[in-house]
Each structure stands twice: as C-alpha cells, then as structure tokens.
C-alpha cells in the first residue's frame, strides 16, 4: 500500500474499528489453558453523552485489556449500562418522552461514541439493567435472598426526598441533601423493604484486610462506614427507681462528667411524651424536617426540649440528670439515647452552652484539673482521669475497662459492640426501576411472586403528569390474583434501589446470555474481577453493596467467592478551568464554554464581544459550570489515538488530569512523529548492530510492560517517548529498524489504530499476525536489561563540568585518565596539573585544580 506522509487518523479509526468488528477480534476467549484476565470499568449511566471522565476511565481499562491479550491471557472485557434511575423519569416529566425510549436512545448514542475510541470490548456481552432479561434475573435473586432470611419488610423512618418523592439510603444523603436532587432530606415513616447487610458487618469489616490491591483510602472509608464501636450499654432509671431507657456509649470513662441525658426525637419515650405535650410534638416535627444524616446533624445548631424528667446517675443514685429530647442524637445508632458529657464531646458542649447546663472536666492532660471546664472547644485528647472518684489517675483505656467491669459486676450494664452500618433500605417510590416481586393479599399477607411468573415487567402505559410513583396510579398493572388463594390482591408498587442493579452485574457479564442469573461454573472460572476501575465516589455506595451481595450469594451456596474485585483502581477526574462573568449582587456568575472563549497569555476574552472573562480555578468538568469538552469534537479534530494518548500521558492516573489544548496538541504531534518513525522499519543503512539502542529497546519493552501491569500509564508513556527519541537520534541500522518495528507493538495498547496502520505496512516477514490486535507482546532479552555502561559526572572543585560514558566497573586509574583527557577538562585546567583527583567508581570524578 502507498504510505501517506501524514497519519490520517479519522480514516484509520473508521477502517480498523470496522476490521476489528468484522473479525470479532475482542470476543471473550476461554481456552482453559491460559491465565484469565477479567478487566472491568464501572459501567456508565446512559445520560446521552460520554464525557472526558468516561474517556479516561475506559482508555485505562482498554490499555490493560489489550496488553493482557498480547501477553497470552484469556480476556473478558465487557460493557453495559446502569440504565434504571430517576433522570429518565425526570426526562419523561420535562420532555414528555417515555423513560424506556429516552434511555435506549441514549444507550445507542453512547455506544456509538465509545466505539469511536476503539475500545477492545466484547460487545456480545452487552447488557442493560432496564431490560427484562436482566432485571427478571435480579428479581429471582431477590426472592432467593428473601427465602434465606436476608430480605424483610418493616415500617420505619426513612430519608424522604421531597423533590424526587422517593426514599434514599443513608449513603445517598450527602450533607443532609438528596444525592441527585440536592433537596433537604426529611424523615418520614413508611413501610419499606430492607436487605440485611448488618448480618455481614463483621465479615465485611474483616474482609477489608484481604483487599491488599485496593486503595488504602477506600478501605478506610468502608471501615469507617461500617463503624464498629465497642463500649458500655446500660439502662438509666428514673428518679425513684423505675426503668427509663438504655444508653450505649463508647466513652464510659467520662461518666462522671455527665450533666444531662438525651434521647432522639424518634425515641419511643419521646413519642410517648409527645402525645401529652403539643410543644414537644411540634419540636419533634421540626426535627424531622431537618436533615437526617450524621454529617448534617454534626454541623446543625444543637436544639433540645427539656422533658422535665430526670434519671439517676448509674454510679451515684443521688445524682440526678435532666432528660432532654435533642436533635443531634440518631435513633438508628446505638440505642437512640446518650448521656451528655460536655467537657469532652463538642456536640454536648455546644448544647450545654446553649441551655446553660453544667460542664464537668474529668480528663486532664497536664496540671489543669479544675472540675469546672470553661473552654469553647471540648477536650478529646489523651490524659488521666480527674474528678472521677475511683477512676482518678487512670488512663482513658484503664478507666473504660474499670467502668465496664463494675457495671457488669453490679448488674447495671455490660460491655457490647454496636455498628454504624444499618440495614440497606432498597424500596424506591419510582417507576423506572426493577419491580419488587411481591404481592399483598388481605388474606395471605405479603407473598413472593412465583419464579414461574418472573419477570414482573413494568407497564409501558404510565402517566408522568403528576409527581410520585406512576405504578401506584396505574389502573390495571397492580391488580393481580394472589398466588396462594387466588383472591384479589395488589402488586408491590415500589421498585428496587438502582444500586441493587450494580451489585451483581459483573456476575452476569461473565455468564453471557443465559436463562439463569449466572452460571456457577463460569463464575468459578472468571471471578473475581481481576482489575476494577472507577471513581472513588463509589467507595461506600456501590463497592460496599457489591461486596455484600457477593457474600450473600456465597452464603446461599450460589458462588464460591467472597470478594468480587481482586484489585481496585480509582482514577482521578478530568478537570478544566472555568470562564465566567459576574451578573450582579446576589446572582450566580454567568458561565461560558471553552468554545466561546479565546484564551491568551494575559487572560481570556469572549469571542462574541471581545471583552474579558474571568478565568476560574481548574475543577471537575460539569455541565453547570460549562467547563466541559465534547469528546466527539476532539475525536473529529485529532482522532482516537491522540485522545487516548493524552488521557494516559499527562498525569499519574490516580490524580486529576487538567485538560489543555497544548496537551492534546502535543499528543497529536507525537502520533505524527511515530508515524514517520514507523516508515523507517526497512531503512537498515550501512550500520551494524547498535548495542546502546538495543539495550534501550529491551529495557523499554520490560519497563513498559511493568508500568502497564501497575497501571502506571504515564510512566509507560514517558518510557516510549524516551525510546522514540533514541531511535530518532540513532543512525540507520538493523537495530534501528527492529526498534521501529517493536515500537509498533509497544504503543499498540495505547494507540491501536496507528499501530494497526503501521503493522500492515510492515513487510510480511516482520508481521507475526495479520493484525496487531492478535500479536504478542515482544519479549525482552534478559541479557540486555542490565546496563554495561554508566554515565560518570566530572566535577572540578565540586562543580559539575562534564560527563562521560564508560564501561561499568572501570577502575580508578582508567576513570582518572579518561576524565583528564576530556577536551572540556583540558581547557579548564589550562595545562596545569591538578592538585588532587577523587574517583568514586561508576559515579564521579572530582578534580581539585
């Protein structure tokens, strides 16, 4: 074929993507003889357009998947769509489209965009969680978990999003607001379905220790969320001796610092008292309109209601503590009741200051032992016990143990463990989700849908003209016969939290299309996922739920593994500076897209009027700030390989990547440099073997392989740049021609279209396979991985003056003679003999003139 002088990226992209598809190049192989590599990026929500964060995420996974194919692995690298969720319903309400049609159109658009990147994906494994063949199997698994006692239904206070009109899990409440709508979350009592994740709290916590290929930060986040706390549980008595309520504390050492007792607004005692107190009832109602997360309550103003009741201090019955209902105690942690120790807990201190309650110091780090504590910040550090009777002089740990021992001996309390983790509420009052497969019968109660009647599919004829769940209002869908008595009954109209959908999709991918949720034998071959890639924002939600789901299925005997993801990588975000103008006092800035702005050395101006705009800081790309870059536009301009190269090259993959025109331009120029180099594979010239270049080539082969294995893509890119530089400087030789040909294979995982084009142009004798997609990674010669030459620094009076390359291990006399013969050193000495020469073999020669 005639070779173009410039690489035509767009034509090559289209040509090779078509060729790979025709050859089924990336179909999953399962020889049973090769090691397996299951590479998976977190599947996307089909919003309609991919963004640069997607591009970076999938480029990383693709490089690893292609590399694993080249190194002799059976590779599973699938793609699918996390396709249920509220945005589709919002589109239905705003645009009058059906959620299913909107979602499937978005999937088609995003699939086409992803294919433009040249991803080595087995598209035959594609799935969408909104299709009955997926969610029907999810319903079957849900019934299996129910049969095993891991699913239950109860009435409880839930996090209610008043805008989206649905329930949120605790993990979906961020700073007291719904994670999607941003609305302040309220508390509401509803009948809900729960998964018993708390049954697995201990093993989920202990299992983190085996995940040595997960980021420490993610493991710590999960550990804190599971929240194992050991402490004392005891029961207060009302003044007079009648039982009052139980309390759990992790700080029994501070009992002598107590100045009040507090209960949650949702505590049974608070609700009982509210029946006879309109003021307390109003206070409780106000608390429930506030946020529900621990984070929001931490920062909110501390409010309380004095019940007028008092309880006896457990260590001194004559010491009475007032009982308050407070807004910062959660019913779903511990017992929903505490004792307040203001001197050593900031929330209690803020509350005590507001309501003028006593503040008693019981821990001191130094000489300050006065009982009355006057500081504005609670002391939470180490120290010894003071003002605490029999505990005085003990360390905190000693005092904790002493109080628990006394409580157990006297029978008023016991040492116990509680968990921050709560059971997973999975009910959602939405249409676009997996229908929960249960039926409510007046005679038989709540009964499961028989598996023979699965899937329970969503009706298409739904009305989104008013907020709420359209399934509740559907005239026929929810009316069914009871599967037990055949009498009139109602379907469950709640749907499952979409995080259920993503808790097992990796199992379905491995099994390909099947009439079961998955094939246990296939799962035994492919799971766990060898490399999982996605954002750290999923550390608690998705990743914890997937771990629970895997362990639950293991408990049911359906799979052998306990952990779904052997190795986890959390990539950084793609960021961009913002461009804006102020709109006036009290108004948000007016933002502009990068296409609307001309960037110069002194700032930026709006193209439309030439006037300046404010250049903001570099932040995550977002539609609201308009600092997004359209991948399609960049692909149209530079082609897939330049985009992939830039995504991999400019920053360590775990860090954020600032988008820049200079960066993508540099990637494009390097693509063209390589294209020119690849045209010189037959130019052997008159030169013989180039040992230095051969060594550089084989060191690069080994180094790039190690970097890709470790997901150090930027390091691999740097090594390839360095090798290209050496090849360009080298004289024509057989070694140089070989290096050019091997370089094609080294860049193939990152620049697959360029590599295919260059591979095809090679002489047939140099090609081991018709396409580079099927080629093997080049072998590095171990003998060439060790340098037999070193670069020596030559100093004069300690200052660097020259360098020289010499044989490794050269003796001191040879190094001194070589250094003194260097033209630069001869010039600097001016014919004079040096006073002294200090030689450090293989490192430096220091000449003292």
UniProtKB/Swiss-Prot annotation:
Annotated motif 'HIGH' region, positions: 44-54
Q: Tell me the leader sequence span.
A: none
An example of a Gene Ontology cellular component annotation for this protein is: cytosol
Kindly list the positions annotated as binding ATP.
623
Chief site of localization: cytoplasm
Q: Which GO terms describe its molecular function?
A: aminoacyl-tRNA deacylase activity; ATP binding; leucine-tRNA ligase activity
According to its UniProt record, the EC number is 6.1.1.4
Subcellular localization: Cytoplasm
Q: Name one GO biological process term.
A: leucyl-tRNA aminoacylation
Question: Per the record's keyword annotation, is Nucleotide-binding included, yes or no?
Answer: yes
> Motif span ('KMSKS' region)?
620-624
Q: Which UniProt keywords apply?
A: Aminoacyl-tRNA synthetase, ATP-binding, Cytoplasm, Ligase, Nucleotide-binding, Protein biosynthesis
Q: Does the keyword Flavoprotein apply?
A: no
- What does the record give as the reaction this protein catalyses? tRNA(Leu) + L-leucine + ATP = L-leucyl-tRNA(Leu) + AMP + diphosphate
Family named by the database record: Belongs to the class-I aminoacyl-tRNA synthetase family.
Per its UniProt record, what PANTHER family does this chain match? LEUCINE--TRNA LIGASE, MITOCHONDRIAL, LEUCYL-TRNA SYNTHETASE
Protein name per UniProt: Leucine--tRNA ligase
Species name: Sphingopyxis alaskensis (strain DSM 13593 / LMG 18877 / RB2256) (Sphingomonas alaskensis)
């Amino acid at each position: 074929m005639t070779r173009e002088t410039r690489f035509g990226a767009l034509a090559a992209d289209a040509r090779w993507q078509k060729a790979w598809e025709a050859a089924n190049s990336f179909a999953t192989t399962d020889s049973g003889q090769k090691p397996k590599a299951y590479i998976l990026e977190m599947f996307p929500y089909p919003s309609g357009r991919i963004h640069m964060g997607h591009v970076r995420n999938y480029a990383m996974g693709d490089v690893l998947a292609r590399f694993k194919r080249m190194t002799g692995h059976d590779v599973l690298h699938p793609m699918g769509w996390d396709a249920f969720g509220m945005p589709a319903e919002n589109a239905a309400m705003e645009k009058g489209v059906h959620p299913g049609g909107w979602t499937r159109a978005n999937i088609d658009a995003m699939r086409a965009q992803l294919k433009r990147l040249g991803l080595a994906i087995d598209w035959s494994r594609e799935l969408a969680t909104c299709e009955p063949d997926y969610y029907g199997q999810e319903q079957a698994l849900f019934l299996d978990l129910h049969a095993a006692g891991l699913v239950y239904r109860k009435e409880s206070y839930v996090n209610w999003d008043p805008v989206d009109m649905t329930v949120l899990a605790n993990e979906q409440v961020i700073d007291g607001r719904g994670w999607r709508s941003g609305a302040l979350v309220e508390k509401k009592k509803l009948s809900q379905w729960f998964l018993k994740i708390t049954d697995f709290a201990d093993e989920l916590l202990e299992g983190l220790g085996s995940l040595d290929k997960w980021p420490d930060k993610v493991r710590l986040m999960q550990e804190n969320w599971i929240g194992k706390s050991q402490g004392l549980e005891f029961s207060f008595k009302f003044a007079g001796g009648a039982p009052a309520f139980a309390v759990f504390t992790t700080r029994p050492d501070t009992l002598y610092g107590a100045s009040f007792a507090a209960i949650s607004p949702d505590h049974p005692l608070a609700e009982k008292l509210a029946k006879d107190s309109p003021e307390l009832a109003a206070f409780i109602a106000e608390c429930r309109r506030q946020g529900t997360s621990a984070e929001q309550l931490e920062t909110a103003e501390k409010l309380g209601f004095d019940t007028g009741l008092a309880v006896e201090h457990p260590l001194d019955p004559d010491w009475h503590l007032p009982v308050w209902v407070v807004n910062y105690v959660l019913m779903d942690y511990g017992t929903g009741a505490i004792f307040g120790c203001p001197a050593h807990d900031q929330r209690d201190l803020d509350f005590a200051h507001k309501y003028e309650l006593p503040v008693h110091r019981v821990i001191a780090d130094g000489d300050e032992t006065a009982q009355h504590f006057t500081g504005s910040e609670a002391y939470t550090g180490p120290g010894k016990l003071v003002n605490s009777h029999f505990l005085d002089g003990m360390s905190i740990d000693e005092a904790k143990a002493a109080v628990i021992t006394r409580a157990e001996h006297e029978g008023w309390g016991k040492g116990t463990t509680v968990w921050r983790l709560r059971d997973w509420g999975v009910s959602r009052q939405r249409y676009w989700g997996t229908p929960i497969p249960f039926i409510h019968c007046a005679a038989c109660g709540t009964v499961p849908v028989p598996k023979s009647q699965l899937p329970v599919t969503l009706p298409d004829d739904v009305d989104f003209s008013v907020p709420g769940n359209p399934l509740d209002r559907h005239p026929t869908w929810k009316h069914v016969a009871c599967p037990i008595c055949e009498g009139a009954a109602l379907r469950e109209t709640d749907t499952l939290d979409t995080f259920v959908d993503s808790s097992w999709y990796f199992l379905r991918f491995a099994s390909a299309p099947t009439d079961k949720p998955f094939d246990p034998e296939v799962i035994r071959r492919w799971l766990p996922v060898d490399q999982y890639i996605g954002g750290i924002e999923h550390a608690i939600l998705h990743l914890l739920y997937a771990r629970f789901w895997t362990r639950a299925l293991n408990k049911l005997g359906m799979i052998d593994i306990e952990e779904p993801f052997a190795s986890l990588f959390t990539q950084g975000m793609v960021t961009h500076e913002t461009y804006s103008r102020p709109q006036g006092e009290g108004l948000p800035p007016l933002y502009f897209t990068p296409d609307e702005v001309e960037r110069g050395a002194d700032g930026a101006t709006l193209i439309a009027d030439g006037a300046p705009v404010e250049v903001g800081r570099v932040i995550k790309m977002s539609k609201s700030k308009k600092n997004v870059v359209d991948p399609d536009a960049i692909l149209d301009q530079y082609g897939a390989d330049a985009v992939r190269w830039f995504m991999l090259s400019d920053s360590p993959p775990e860090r954020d990547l600032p988008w820049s025109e200079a960066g993508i331009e540099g990637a494009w120029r390097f693509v063209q440099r390589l294209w020119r180099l690849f045209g010189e594979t037959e130019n052997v010239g008159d030169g013989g073997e180039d040992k230095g270049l051969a060594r550089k080539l084989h060191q690069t082969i080994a180094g790039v392989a190690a970097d890709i294995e470790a997901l150090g893509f930027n390091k691999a890119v740097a090594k390839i740049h360095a090798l290209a530089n050496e090849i360009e400087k080298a004289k024509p030789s057989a070694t140089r021609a070989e290096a050019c040909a091997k370089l094609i294979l080294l860049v193939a995982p990152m620049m697959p279209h360029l590599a295919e084009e260059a591979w095809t142009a090679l002489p047939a004798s140099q090609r081991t396979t018709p396409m580079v997609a099927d080629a093997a990674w080049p072998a590095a010669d171990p003998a060439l991985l060790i340098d037999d030459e070193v670069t020596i620094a030559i100093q004069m009076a300690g200052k660097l003056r020259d360098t020289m390359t010499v044989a490794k291990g050269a003796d001191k006399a040879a190094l001194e003679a070589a250094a003194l013969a260097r033209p630069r050193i001869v010039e600097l000495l001016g014919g004079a003999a040096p006073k002294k020469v200090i030689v450090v073999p293989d490192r430096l020669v220091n000449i003292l003139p």
